[in-house]
Amino acid sequence: VWLFGGPYFGFWESAMAGAGAFFSNGGPIQGTASCPRKFVVMGFNYQRGVGEMLEDLGHRAESILARVWKSEDFLGYAYDRARNINALSNRQFNLFERFMLFDQIAPGKSNVGSVHYAPNSHSDYEWGIATPVQSCADDWLQFPNLPDPPNFRTLTARDWGGGDIRAHHKWWLSRLPKVPGATNGISNFWWKYFIDPNTVK
């Protein structure tokens, strides 16, 4: 369900409704348990652009995939501005967590990053800084056949749009796995989980 409204309408960027609804970057929406299926309501703002709509979808994906991979703590950490940089030093990353790595939280191990953090970002929404970074983000285009060891190469903001929100988010979404099969009991078509939350166990 897509809703469009003006500023201060109070919409969540995305919120889930229905029986068994869970957090999806907002909500869950109360009073909807009588609906037998889960569905997500997207709340868009007429004052914002397509880039922000893609950002809303990206956060929906992050939240739901974090639940699939049991990585809610990791997602919270990745967005915590007061994070302890050493907190992940001994962590064995699952595939979702590895996808989300950016240089600030995993120096030398940058993958695709998050919706707010490109592989070289130092802070939220910093998609255009010129600092080069070693990243294996393009390995994700080969999923599930991720190279071992990863193919780290030098990337810059030019690779994901030079600071353009829409270009970065399209780049990020294009690397989310979307192929047949399963790995460790989780579908290789990650999109199915955040497009249809009824597929989330």
Task: Give the predicted meaning of each segment.
Residues 4-8, 43-45, 63:
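Active-site-proximal beta-strand/loop segments in catalytic clefts of secreted hydrolases
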Residues 22-46, 171:
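Flexible, surface-exposed loop/gating regions in the mature catalytic domains
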Residues 1-26:
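Active-site-proximal segments of metallohydrolase catalytic domains
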Residues 42, 48, 160-162:
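Surface-exposed extracytoplasmic segments
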Residues 47-68:
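Active-site recognition of the HExxH zinc-binding catalytic motif
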Residues 10-14, 61-62, 69-70:
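Short catalytic/ligand-binding loop motif for oxyanion handling, primarily in non-cytosolic enzymes
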Residues 25, 53-57, 181-184, 192:
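Acidic, proline/glycine-rich low-complexity IDRs
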